[in-house]
Design a protein with these regions (language model features):
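Residue-level recognition of alpha-helical structural elements
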Residues: 1, 24-31, 47-54, 70, ...
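Hydrophobic, amphipathic alpha-helical faces that serve as interaction scaffolds
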Residues: 1-24, 59-97, 133
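Amphipathic alpha-helical dimerization/coiled-coil segments
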Residues: 12-44
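C-terminal all-alpha effector/ligand-binding and dimerization domain
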Residues: 36-43, 48, 83-141
Length: 141
């Protein structure tokens, strides 16, 4: 189940990011600002060791990426996938037992590639970031 959820998230989020990267500059910058805001919150909560708040900001960051595609059907599908992810991820792996340093660093790198409008690197890093969840689950089992 974890693998299927992560694979589906990867498909949706990378597609959405590719669509967002094709936007005209003004629209692109507005969407980028939203993603930056959540990335900054993740970093702030990481420094404050607020794992619940960080996890919520992380979910919002990924949702903002999907919303960047301007596709309501995709958003609706993603809400269901994100719900399944919450169940398999947060019930199986307690928040307080996690190391979020890699998550925050990944967000920083993804954001840099988005800012540079390097679609390939941004999508590849996002894909690796989500797929890292599968590896972390395997380590915990």
């Amino acid at each position: 189940m974890v693998k299927q959820v992560c694979e589906t998230r990867t498909l949706i989020e990378t597609y959405a990011l590719e669509k967002m990267m094709q936007e005209e500059e003004e629209v692109f910058q507005q969407k980028l600002d939203v993603i930056k805001r959540y990335s900054d919150k993740c970093e702030e909560y990481y420094r404050q060791e607020k794992s619940v708040e960080l996890a919520l900001a992380d979910l919002e960051l990924h949702k903002a990426i999907v919303e960047g595609a301007n596709n309501e059907i995709l958003n609706d599908v993603y809400v269901g996938i994100q719900g399944r992810f919450i169940v398999v991820n947060y019930l199986i792996r307690p928040l307080k037992n996690r190391n979020y340093e890699g998550t925050v660093q990944d967000h920083f790198e993804i954001l840099k590639f988005i800012e540079d409008r390097d679609t390939k690197k941004a999508v590849d890093k996002l894909r690796n970031h989500i797929q890292g969840t599968i590896k972390r689950f395997c380590e915990d089992e």
